[in-house]
From Swiss-Prot:
This is Cytochrome c oxidase assembly protein cox18, mitochondrial. It is a multi-pass membrane protein. GO terms for cellular component: mitochondrial inner membrane; mitochondrion. It comes from Schizosaccharomyces pombe (strain 972 / ATCC 24843) (Fission yeast). The keyword Ribosomal protein does not apply. It is found in: Mitochondrion inner membrane.
Length: 202
């Protein structure tokens, strides 16, 4: 992927290539998963009344878990599938960030001069902290949209982990190169627009 980044750089400056990279990866990899995840989430919400009724009816937790498992299978809405998107995004995030960090090391001269607006040097942290701040707000807004009320311990763990990761990545954005902050922020904004649009269209 590093060679591809350097190759594409022959046709556009880094300040455009980095956002384009984020949009391309989001559109080709995470968008299809997001669509499937949203459909699963809606089926999950629809089956909640049946699960609550089963919880009242079942005498033991073992019976309840058995019935709940059958309902998830029947409606094809296992809670884990709702979080297929963040589970997929984690390795993609790590891989893309690593490749971009390598690009900063390999191409320091062009990275230091091909920024834009207030961040002209992509090898340094955002001088005004604007991108990290936007990243934090976007992440938290996304989490509020994706959060699903549920008694499932697994979903509660994912919700908590999502909020913690949002604060961690936003904090790191204040310390790392603007190249990475630009990629993370573009990716987060794309994700937010994607989630809002899908909820209106699907």
């Amino acid at each position: 992927m590093l060679q591809t980044l350097i190759g594409v750089h022959s046709y556009m400056p880094w300040c455009y290539e980095i956002p384009a990279m984020a949009i391309f990866l989001r559109s080709t990899i995470t968008l299809p998963i997001a669509i499937a995840s949203l459909k699963t989430a809606r089926r999950f919400v629809q089956v909640q009344p049946l699960i609550k009724e089963a919880k009242k009816r079942c005498r033991t937790n073992t019976d309840f878990r058995t019935v709940r498992k059958k309902l998830y299978k029947r409606f094809n809405c296992h809670p884990l599938m709702i979080y297929a998107l963040p589970i997929t995004q984690l390795p993609l995030f790590a891989f893309a960030s690593y490749q971009l960090r390598q690009a900063v090391d390999v191409c320091p001269e062009s990275m230091s001069t091909e920024g834009m607006l207030w961040f002209t040097d992509l090898t340094l942290p955002d001088p005004h902290g604007v991108l990290p701040a936007v990243l934090a707000v976007t992440y938290l807004t996304n989490m509020s949209i994706l959060k699903r009320p549920s008694d499932s311990r697994l979903l509660k763990i994912f919700n908590t982990a999502g909020i913690m990761s949002a604060f961690f990545v936003s904090f790191m954005a204040f310390k790392t190169s603007t190249a990475l902050s630009l990629y993370w922020t573009t990716s987060a904004i794309y994700s937010l627009v994607q989630n809002v649009a899908l909820r209106k269209l699907l």
